[in-house]
């Protein structure tokens, strides 16, 4: 697969470069030249393959890595992710079943394998997104919904915006995701954009980085260029009505304050006997707010990134 820059229409880059560099020479972010799309028939196949096979398939598409399911099993274990079905149509995806009891261990292990075990110190920006996409596809394949390719919502902590970006791309690739429910401990660029149609460009660089790639995925080069120009001038960015409609069709943002998180965790444990981690609690808070506002009760995949038992 070749990659483009969010800030250029002409230059293209190899997967090897994307694995070792965060940005293009013009300061842009790497984006796929053309996203693959999985048909409903292909989505149904997810439930018939192992977790490792599904992860390998997606990563091979992005990086031509020639990985196998055995490669994934060897570096991550045969069951690095487990799903726990709970009442109220909530499915918790525990992405931390490894020796470090943390998702970042699996992410680093997969990245090292992609880099031919060269023990790179830091996972690059797009590699993180691609690995999350692969994990989301593979995790969906372990759920009951995968057997009939049913839509699910995904609830998550959106602090770094890497995971929402990955979920957005997975949705565009054909993974049956209804809404991406983003919880933040405070208002941020995505919350501002969805609720106000505008956002300050004086925010943290990591938030703006995620937003640049998201805007590009919706409006292409022109929209991204306008956003970058606004950021350079440190002005308020106003999203177009069309783009705002596209965002609201797939994203929901809620503030789940640090004072609310412990009560969410305690209440969930009392009701279901399950101890969720603080990051999952932020995602669950977003799910509560979304369901209270819309009345929606679709099955929801809640992402848990570390053991909190």
Identify the meaning behind each predicted range.
Residues 1-309:
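PLP-dependent amino-acid enzyme catalytic core
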